Amino acid sequence: MPDYDNYTTPLSSRYASKEMSATFSLRNRFSTWRKLWLNLAIAEKELGLTVVTDEAIEQMRKHVEITDDEIAKASAQEAIVRHDVMAHVHTFGETCPAAAGIIHLGATSCFVTDNADLIFIRDAYDIIIPKLVNVINRLAKFAMEYKDLPVLGWTHFQPAQLTTLGKRATLWIQELLWDLRNFERARNDIGLRGVKGTTGTQASFLALFHGNHDKVEALDERVTELLGFDKVYPVTGQTYSRKIDIDVLAPLSSFAATAHKMATDIRLLANLKEVEEPFEKSQIGSSAMAYKRNPMRCERVCSLARHLGSLFSDAVQTASVQWFERTLDDSAIRRISLPSAFLTADILLSTLLNISSGLVVYPKVIERRIKGELPFMATENIIMAMVEKNASRQEVHERIRVLSHQAAAVVKEEGGENDLIERVKRDEFFKPIWEELDSLLEPSTFVGRAPQQVEKFVQKDVNNALQPFQKYLNDEQVKLNV
């Protein structure tokens, strides 16, 4: 039954995918602890600890997935002992009596908590990387589709030289490619804390193996292997260095900036009525203004991107204040910031997937806006054409300057249309180029190499970057909960 009397974060209850929510769920956390205890016991037995029996391992393996009743029992136990790990040690031991005496043998709490966090981080990156790949792929298709469509460029949000809609999309894609590189690097850099003991010296395991250093090292390597990792951090304190969390969250925060910029661009384009995010037939934009088509998905992206970007400072500050081998003031904030970061990144990517799959373009609006500004941009072309007809460059410049100011006054002071070209056509001075004016005002001649840049970028940079991820590419429609 839903619990309507307790607060739940909207990240999981409203927005995030079931897959990401499950990754950071209590069930997965506590079941992962059990997997860690199981694999520790397996490795200890393989290396000769006879106190670990086959029966103990079989019972642990059978009950590695924690039940609702066991979660409740451990929660009640934690209220008594004030230690979450020991509460679960006792609960697991009650379920697996043959293993009760060897669960957590030689380990400290961070064996399960830190190693589990590293597993969650790896798994979370494995969820968001395919989504990022598909966002890039869909935007690349959009860029190619509109590589030749001239649009008014904007600098300082003032009209500037023309570009193409496809070229504008490549600016988003390029930053997303950098994010993909950063995600992959962060994911592949993750190792395990491993089997290190209370202060990282492995003293407890050295005692278990009666001073046999080789077996302690073998234990560390075997547990790492059993958990599916190819590397373990060579030295730690009680915890793995919290600087690793910085390396984990930095790419996510950087991606947040990319997402915010892209969504902001689309929001501005929606105001200009040139490009809009998808809008469902039954979607309501405003409870009062029935005509509204608000860019609510892009607005959500901007909102959550600000949250994701802010979490990076949590990691930086936490890493900087860790004393010696560890302090516990990292614990509470990490329980919040790490899941929040990945849940938020997951939401952003799902939303961007939805947006990029259904962007709506209005070419006629784009064309009308270009026509309103292009005459001013074409003045240099007009000057050059007149000079080729043996006119004085300075005289042409002065005449076109006067006409441009008159046309600007019509636009700004009277609210009229830009009539510069009509003024040029009425001025006998410009008669030598009247027949050329239409060609001088062809928008495609003002976009430079934008179409060629799009083709080269997609065919070379994008395709090469996506080549290792072909198995993830799909055209599935992403449905958002809200």
Curated annotation (Swiss-Prot):
Keyword Transmembrane helix attributed: no
PANTHER family: ADENYLOSUCCINATE LYASE
One Gene Ontology cellular component: cytosol
Cross-link (Glycyl lysine isopeptide (Lys-Gly) (interchain with G-Cter in ubiquitin)): 196
EC number: 4.3.2.2
Involved pathway(s): Purine metabolism; AMP biosynthesis via de novo pathway; AMP from IMP: step 2/2; Purine metabolism; IMP biosynthesis via de novo pathway; 5-amino-1-(5-phospho-D-ribosyl)imidazole-4-carboxamide from 5-amino-1-(5-phospho-D-ribosyl)imidazole-4-carboxylate: step 2/2
GO BP field: 'de novo' AMP biosynthetic process; 'de novo' IMP biosynthetic process; purine nucleotide biosynthetic process
Superkingdom, taxonomy of origin: Eukaryota
Sequence similarity: Belongs to the lyase 1 family. Adenylosuccinate lyase subfamily.
EC top class, as a word: lyase
Active site: residue positions: 156, 286
Quaternary structure, from the entry: Homotetramer. Residues from neighboring subunits contribute catalytic and substrate-binding residues to each active site.
Pfam families, per the entry: ADSL_C (PF10397), Lyase_1 (PF00206)
Gene Ontology molecular function terms on file: (S)-2-(5-amino-1-(5-phospho-D-ribosyl)imidazole-4-carboxamido) succinate lyase (fumarate-forming) activity; N6-(1,2-dicarboxyethyl)AMP AMP-lyase (fumarate-forming) activity
Gene3D superfamilies: 1.10.275.60, Fumarase/aspartase (C-terminal domain) (1.10.40.30), Fumarase/aspartase (Central domain) (1.20.200.10)
Statement: the UniProt record of this protein carries the keyword Isomerase: no
Protein name (Swiss-Prot/TrEMBL): Adenylosuccinate lyase
Binding site for substrate: 14-15, 82-84, 108-109, 238, 300, 326, 331, 335
Keyword annotations: Isopeptide bond, Lyase, Purine biosynthesis, Ubl conjugation
